[in-house]
């Protein structure tokens, strides 16, 4: 949770109480949100859909990349480039450019160029890899996006909604639950909480791409995470 002065009143139904000046999220609501998100994401994956993982804040970058790579899904963890969804054709052209530069580097053509040009091209390549490496294999817009910190990733959410792409997102006490179709009330600042949730969504993808998942199996992972979630929802250091 966050300090009381930073809360969003729309989050009131998801708040258990307060500890000093910090609001504490209701873990029953967190568990319910996790169950709903798990069911949705696993069904998207089961039907051959893709889920784009998005988390550009420092606490989320590693967890988002690791979770997405584990379940074979694309991710954005450095910077959301405007138009990543709404101007996808242009973004794909930048990915193609990145792959062309990588090929030049790999086969030695870049080394044959003048030093100044090599420096410029390597700088361009480094920037492209930083921003686009996680979506190099994303050939079309995703069927859903999973977002850590809906306030920070508001541009990504806005683009998703313009294209009617459902959003799964973490909801801390300062967030707007109306921004997402599937909200998970949770601490979005603590690294342990972020990793837990990113891994949880990756598990849902893996379950969906594997054997059919029963309702009981869908609920099991969320129940197993209930204890760590209690710590995850505790107040993060400001």
Task: Describe these PLM feature segments.
Residues 156-215:
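Short glycine/threonine-rich loop/turn motifs
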Residues 53, 145, 197:
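Residue-level signature of catalytic and energy-coupling elements of molecular machines
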Residues 71-178, 182:
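Long, charge-patterned amphipathic alpha-helical coiled-coil/hairpin "stalk" segments used as oligomerization
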Residues 54-57, 147-149:
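Short His-Asn-centered micro-motif
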Residues 38, 125, 198:
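Short amphipathic alpha-helical/adjacent loop interface patches that line ligand
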